[in-house]
C-alpha cells in the first residue's frame, strides 16, 4: 500500500522538524519535503506532487491565506492549516476553511515539542481524512436568494444540525438562505475551543438569521442559530413551556466534545416530532445513533448526499443505521428543512 505523501510549509524550523517526526512515525504516511515559505513550497509541490499539504497561517514573503487562495485556484489539493490559538488567527483559520482548506490543527501555546508530539494521532487522523476528502466547492461570497417561509405561529419547531470535517462551509450553505422567520437551530460542529466564537460571528454577518455561540441557560428563540462552544457539549433542555440551551463539560462521546449524538439525543427527548435533524459532511459515526433516536421520536431527518460531502462518513453511518428519511444535495437542504417544518408533517416512516 502506498504511503500518503505530505508536504509541510512552516517558517519555524522546529515546527518543520516536529511535523516531519510525527508524519514519519506513522507507517501509512511520509513527509516528502518541508518548506520554510510558500514560494519554496511552490517548487516543491511541482517536484514531489504531495497528496496533502500542511500550511502555517502566518509566514514571511507570502502569508498562508494568500498562498492557499492561489493554490486552490491553480492546483487544488487537500490542505490542513496549522494555526496558533489567538483571536486573530481563529478568524484567519475560518477564512482558510472558506477558501477550501479541509481542516486545521492548533499549535500548543506552551511546550511546543511536547504538545505537538501529544497531538501525533490527531494530526495523523486529519492527514488521513484530508487524503481521502473531496475538495469542497467554494460557497459564493454574495448572499444566495433568501427562501420564502410563512412565519411560524409556534416556537415549538426546531432544527438540529451536526457536522465535522468540511462542515463549516456546509453549515454556511445551509444557513445563508434562511429567512428571519426560520425556526431555531441548534448546531454542533466538531471544533476546538477558541474557534467557535469566530465561526458564529462570521456566520452572523453573512446570514439573515441571528447566529451566535450558545450560552448555558439561554432561551432558544426562533430566527436564531446556536453553535456549540468548542470542547463543550450542547444540549436542548426545557424550562416550563420554553426550550433552553444547556452547555456542559460531560465526557467525550465518540471521541468528540462537542458531540453530535449528545445534541441529537436531547432534541429527540425534548422536541420529538417537532424537530428536523440534519447530518452533514464529516468523518466517523458521531450523530448516527442520535439521528436514529430523533427519527424514532417522530422527527424528520436528512443526510447530505455523498456527491456534495467533503467526507461522506457521518451521513453514510446515519443512513446505514436506518435513521434517515431523505438524502439530499447540500444546496437543497435549506429548502427541504423549511418545507417540512411548514407542512407540519414531521413524522415520516
From Swiss-Prot:
Its domain of life reads: Bacteria
Which function does this protein serve? Involved in chemotaxis. Part of a chemotaxis signal transduction system that modulates chemotaxis in response to various stimuli. Catalyzes the demethylation of specific methylglutamate residues introduced into the chemoreceptors (methyl-accepting chemotaxis proteins or MCP) by CheR. Also mediates the irreversible deamidation of specific glutamine residues to glutamic acid.
- Database matches in HAMAP family: CheB_chemtxs
Name the EC number(s).
3.1.1.61, 3.5.1.44
Per the record, what is one GO cellular component?
cytoplasm
> What name goes with this protein?
Protein-glutamate methylesterase/protein-glutamine glutaminase
Judged by the first EC level, this protein's enzyme class is hydrolase
Origin species, per record, is Yersinia pestis
Q: Which SUPFAM superfamilies match?
A: CheY-like, Methylesterase CheB, C-terminal domain
Q: Which reaction does it catalyse?
A: [protein]-L-glutamate 5-O-methyl ester + H2O = L-glutamyl-[protein] + methanol + H(+); L-glutaminyl-[protein] + H2O = L-glutamyl-[protein] + NH4(+)
Q: Which residues carry this modification: 4-aspartylphosphate?
A: 56
Compartments it resides in = Cytoplasm
Amino acid at each position: 500500500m502506498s504511503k500518503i505523501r505530505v508536504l509541510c510549509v512552516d517558517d519555524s524550523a522546529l515546527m518543520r522538524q516536529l511535523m516531519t517526526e510525527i508524519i514519519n512515525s506513522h507507517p501509512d504516511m511520509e513527509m516528502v519535503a518541508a518548506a520554510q515559505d510558500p514560494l519554496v513550497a511552490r517548487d516543491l509541490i511541482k517536484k514531489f506532487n504531495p497528496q496533502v499539504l500542511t500550511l502555517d497561517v502566518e509566514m514571511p514573503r507570502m502569508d498562508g491565506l494568500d498562498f492557499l487562495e492561489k493554490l486552490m485556484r491553480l492546483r487544488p489539493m487537500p490542505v490542513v492549516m496549522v494555526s496558533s490559538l489567538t483571536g486573530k488567527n481563529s478568524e484567519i483559520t475560518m477564512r482558510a476553511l472558506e477558501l477550501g482548506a479541509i481542516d486545521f490543527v492548533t499549535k500548543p501555546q506552551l511546550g511546543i515539542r511536547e504538545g505537538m508530539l501529544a497531538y501525533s494521532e490527531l494530526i495523523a487522523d486529519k492527514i488521513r481524512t484530508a487524503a481521502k476528502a473531496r475538495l469542497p466547492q467554494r460557497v459564493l461570497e454574495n448572499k444566495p436568494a433568501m427562501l420564502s417561509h410563512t412565519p411560524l405561529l409556534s416556537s415549538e419547531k426546531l432544527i438540529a444540525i451536526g457536522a465535522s470535517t468540511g462542515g463549516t462551509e456546509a453549515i454556511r450553505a445551509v444557513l445563508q438562505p434562511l429567512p428571519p422567520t426560520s425556526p431555531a437551530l441548534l448546531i454542533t460542529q466538531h471544533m476546538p475551543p477558541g474557534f467557535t466564537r469566530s465561526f458564529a460571528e462570521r456566520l452572523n454577518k453573512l446570514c439573515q438569521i441571528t447566529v451566535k455561540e450558545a450560552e448555558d441557560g439561554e432561551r432558544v428563540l426562533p430566527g436564531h442559530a446556536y453553535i456549540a462552544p468548542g470542547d463543550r457539549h450542547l444540549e436542548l433542555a426545557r424550562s416550563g413551556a420554553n426550550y433552553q440551551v444547556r452547555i456542559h463539560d460531560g465526557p467525550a462521546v465518540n471521541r468528540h466534545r462537542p458531540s453530535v449524538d449528545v445534541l441529537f439525543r436531547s432534541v429527540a427527548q425534548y422536541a420529538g416530532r417537532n424537530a428536523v435533524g440534519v447530518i452533514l459532511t464529516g468523518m466517523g459515526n458521531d450523530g448516527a445513533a442520535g439521528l436514529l433516536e430523533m427519527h424514532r421520536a417522530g422527527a424528520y431527518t436528512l443526510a447530505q448526499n455523498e456527491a456534495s460531502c467533503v467526507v461522506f462518513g457521518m451521513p453514510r453511518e446515519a443512513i446505514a443505521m436506518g435513521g434517515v428519511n431523505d438524502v439530499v444535495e447540500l444546496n437543497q437542504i435549506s429548502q427541504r428543512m423549511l418545507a417540512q417544518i411548514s407542512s407540519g408533517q414531521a413524522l415520516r416512516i
